Design a protein with these regions (language model features):
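Phosphate/dinucleotide-binding and metal-coordinating scaffold of catalytic cores
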Residues: 1-140
Length: 140
């Protein structure tokens, strides 16, 4: 993927460039953390996150995703979730996920993803129970 006038998160940090909208930027990072836990991407680093000139975040390099671990990668930073994603995470049927992913993933990769999804649901629900829905869930 090529994005004109973009920078990596690594360069943004190095050059100390503040996001235009820190709150939205942090929420985008929450969704990255959720996604990386769901697919068990164990190679997320500041060099494979690209920020376009509108401050949209692009995740690149998922070559080390869909690991066979049933546990979550690291949910310590995952403290919020977008409401629609939260709803879909809870309601999507395993069979629907399997049907969509089976052309691309092996059965055991899908099985691990589904187990991680359940653990993400538990994690986010625990946060909601402890902090309240408005503190955890957000809407774009």
């Amino acid at each position: 993927i090529w994005i004109e006038h973009a920078m990596t998160e690594k360069n943004r940090r190095k050059d100390r460039i503040a996001p235009v909208d820190r709150i939205r930027f942090n929420k985008e990072w929450q969704m990255i953390d959720l996604f990386d836990n769901l697919v068990f991407n164990d190679d997320r680093n500041s060099g494979n996150v690209i920020i376009d000139n509108a401050w949209g975040i692009w995740m690149i390099d998922h070559t080390r995703a869909f690991r066979l671990f049933d546990d979550l990668k690291d949910v310590s930073r995952l403290t919020q979730c977008e409401r629609t994603v939260w709803s879909k995470l809870q309601t999507v049927e395993d069979a629907a996920v399997t049907d969509v992913l089976k052309p691309y993933l092996r059965p055991y990769e899908i099985e691990s993803l589904l187990k991680r999804r359940q653990k993400l649901i538990i994690h986010i629900q625990t946060l909601i129970d402890e902090k309240g829905e408005d503190a955890v869930l957000f809407t774009w």
